[in-house]
Structures are given as C-alpha cells and as structure tokens.
From Swiss-Prot:
Domain Radical SAM core: 155-376
PROSITE patterns: RADICAL_SAM (PS51918)
Keyword Iron-sulfur: yes
Localization per Swiss-Prot or TrEMBL: Mitochondrion
Listed CDD domains: Radical_SAM
Ligand binding ([4Fe-4S] cluster 1): C141, C146, C152, S387
Transit peptide: 1-37
Binding residues annotated for [4Fe-4S] cluster 2, in chain numbering: C172, C176, C179
InterPro entries, A to Z: Aldolase_TIM, Elp3/MiaA/NifB-like_rSAM, LIAS_N, Lipoyl_synth, rSAM
Organism taxonomic ancestry: Eukaryota, Fungi, Dikarya, Ascomycota, Pezizomycotina
MF-aspect GO terms: 4 iron, 4 sulfur cluster binding; lipoate synthase activity; metal ion binding
Protein name in UniProt: Lipoyl synthase, mitochondrial
Length: 430
C-alpha cells in the first residue's frame, strides 16, 4: 500500500514539474511517464528511461498459420471475370504443383482457373431460394455444393432456368466417398406433403426443365419409388408443360420399382454410374455396383422405349483411358442416350482426394468420342454435373419433338398413368 502511495506522489510531482516545460516538450515526456506506471511489474528504472527494456521476442509461426498460408485463397473459388486460357505448359505446372508447409506432406490445394465460378446473384436465384425455405424443400444444388447453382437457377439466353429438387429428405442411407450429403442408417420419415409442396413450388417458378433426385432410402421397402412417382404425377398435374428429369437411385436392384418410376410421366430417366467399373468399389457405397447401375438403366429403357436415358461419370478419380472406353461401350450397349463428364471436386477433407485436375481440352476430347459412338447428347467439362444445365436447348427440343409425335397415343398414355396411380396407392397392376 505504501509503495502504491509513493508511486502516486512521484507521478503527481512529475506532472507538476512538466507544467514549467514548453508545450511542445510535454506530450513525449508525459507519455513516457504514464507508460512507466502502466504495468503490474516492478519498474526500477528512472522515469522516461526505457533503455533497459528487454527486446520483444517474436513468436514462431504456428501450424495453423502454415495451414492457412498453404490453403486456397478466396479468389481460388470465385472469379468475377473470365480467365484467359492456359497454354499447355501452364496447365501442366498447375496439375503438378504441390504446396504445403515445410516438413509436411504436400498436396494440390489451389484450384485451376477453369474451376472458378461467379457469385450467385439474380432475381430468379433469390426467388427460388426463398420458396425452397418456405416449403421445406431441399435441392442437391445446395446439399452437394454444386458450383453451377447461379447458372442453373438463373437460366440463360440458351436455356430455361432449371433446379434439382432432392426428394425424401436430406439424409442418405448410403455413404459414397465422393458425396457431401448427410448419412444415417435411420433417416427421418418421409414428408407426406412433399409431392404437393414440390409441385406447388415448381408451378410458381416458371421453370422449363426440372430435375428430381433423391437420397437413397434403403430403410424403405420400395426404396421410395412410390413417393418419387407420386411427385412426378403431381408436377404434371399442376404444370403439364414442364419437362421432368428423374435422377434416381438403384432401388437395391428392384427393377419393378425402376419400371414404376419410368412410367410415372417423366421425360428423362437418369441414373449415374459415377465412375468406371474398376474404381466403383473404392468410390461408391458397397451396396452399389457398376453392373447393377447398368441393369437399372436397361430396365428403364425396356419399361418405356421412347424414354431418354442418361448417366454421368466423374473424371479425376484415377481412371485410365482404357477404363473410360470400356464404360462408354457398356453404356451404348444398353442404349443409354445421354452421358455427361465432370471433374470430381473433393467436398471436404473427409472425402476422397482428387487424383487429377483434368484439363478442359481432355473433356472436349471425350465429348467428341461419346458423340462419335452414337450418344444422342453429351455435356462434358470441368464444372459439368449430371443435372448441369439440364434444360439445354438441344435436349428440350428433342423432348418437345417427341412429345408432339406421341400426342396421338392418348389412350395408351391414360392406361399407363392409371396403372402407375394404382401402384403408387399400393394396389396391384391389372
């Protein structure tokens, strides 16, 4: 206590002596005086004397700081302008670039410029997002962190706006090593209002093309096929002119359920093989297989021959050229009409690492090869996803042309529709 009082008296006397100094000299000395007492440690040096102050020791860089410096910057994900194309040397340098803190395992963390996208910003995008929240609907666009959400939801001069609705909740019973959707053995029960809510939302948006997909529901006896078919029928009732693509699971190999969905009134039946056969056990859930996916696509075409069938493959997982050729031949052998190629992008550190960032010219090459093999249409590029710009003008025109040619077979369509309704209701087909 005495020590504190002594310090205060010293400070007061020092302040009094300052008043006799010229104004220009006061601030520096006052600051030094106050600093000498603004500490809880003893300070035995004279007032204003800082010559004995120990030098500041610089803290070593932390592991966290190293990780931040090695990781991708914000500009690696978003770009407001179109990048100039890279020459082959620059592309190879990016492909082989390894970064990371010294003394640790290095990996590719910076994205090539062809994987940059614009920030979503359009009135259509905002309207769709608000309606989704209000009707408690999910989209694979958001759940799977798709980079094309701005293009699809906003539309373009070449194609109508599209959206991919994810049915049956946001929790999957499978755990594929490339997918960021939540997984659980016991997901929540189905929402009985979802078919009506989905149809209501789509009738508001004025979309030209919609993709319906779903999580896998191995906990349900029918895998959710009846729920899927009911949703398609509700949409067609409220918006008969909208084109509907269904990207389905494999229904645990139950081909009767595949036929049920194929006859529900959809325009495109899609089921993804995801990767080549050799990599399937390492990429997809153990309950899925390349051959089972082929059987699903074949059954859909058999149930409704005029139906467009579609599948998708990811590149950059370590597949070889020979394996890709084999996959395309197998798909053409069962008359798959449309195939898409896209770059695999690792959603989180818990998922499979990217083996390679495939150059855009390689995607162009595989598009040419697919079309030469007889595929009706092929979308191929680093940012292409299975439902990316599904409303492409070419597919829309093909579907509308087929719709006009088939307009005369009304009785056949009515009979099929009635049979599907009975199956959805749990009745036996007559």
């Amino acid at each position: 206590m005495a020590t504190s009082a002594g310090k205060l008296r010293t400070l007061y006397s020092a302040h009094s002596s300052l008043s006799s100094l010229p104004p220009s000299a006061r601030p520096t000395l006052q600051l030094a005086t106050l600093r000498s007492y603004a500490t809880t440690t003893p300070h035995d040096s004279p007032i204003g004397n800082t010559s004995n102050t120990p030098p500041t020791v610089k803290r070593p860089a932390t592991a966290f700081k190293d990780k931040l410096n090695a990781g991708p910057a914000f500009s690696d994900f978003v770009s407001g302008k179109k990048d100039e194309p890279l020459d082959p040397a620059e592309a190879y340098a990016l492909k082989t670039a390894l970064v990371g803190p010294p003394g640790r395992k290095k990996e590719i963390t910076r994205l090539p410029p062809w994987l940059k996208t614009a920030i979503p910003d359009s009135s259509n995008y905002k309207r769709i997002k608000n309606d989704l929240r209000g009707l408690n609907l999910h989209t694979v666009c958001e759940e799977a962190r798709c980079p094309n959400i701005a293009d699809c939801w906003g539309g373009s001069s070449k194609s109508a706006a599209t959206a991919t609705i994810m049915l049956m909740g946001d929790t999957c019973t499978r755990g594929c090593r490339f997918c960021s959707v939540k997984t659980s053995n016991k997901p929540p029960p189905l929402d009985p209002h979802e078919p009506d809510n989905t149809a209501e939302a789509l009738s508001r948006w004025g979309l030209g093309y919609v993709v319906l997909t779903s999580v896998d529901r191995d906990d349900l006896a029918d895998g959710g096929a009846r729920h899927f078919a009911e949703t398609v029928m509700k949409i067609k009732q409220k918006a008969p002119n909208i084109l509907v693509e269904c990207l389905t699971g494999d229904y645990a190999g139950d081909l009767d359920m595949v036929a049920l969905v194929a006859n529900s009134g959809l325009d495109v039946f899609a089921h993804n093989v995801e990767t080549v056969e050799a990599l399937t056990p390492f990429v997809r859930d153990r309950r899925a297989s390349f051959q089972q996916s082929l059987r699903v696509l074949k059954a859909a075409k058999a149930a409704k021959p005029e139906l467009i069938t579609k599948t998708s493959l990811m590149l950059g997982l370590g597949e070889t050229e020979a394996q890709l050729w084999d996959a395309l031949r197998a798909l053409r052998a069962i008359n798959v009409d449309v195939v898409t190629f896209g770059q695999y992008m690792r959603p989180t550190k818990r998922h499979m690492a990217v083996h390679e960032y495939v150059r855009p010219d390689v995607f162009d090459l595989w598009k040419e090869r697919a079309l030469e093999m007889g595929f009706l249409y092929c979308a191929s590029g680093p940012l292409v996803r299975s439902s990316y710009k599904a409303g492409e003008a070419f597919i829309e025109n093909v579907l509308k042309k087929r719709r006009g040619e088939n307009a005369g077979s009304v009785n056949e369509k009515v009979t099929t529709s009635e049979n599907v309704k009975k199956l959805v209701a749990g009745e036996a087909m007559m």
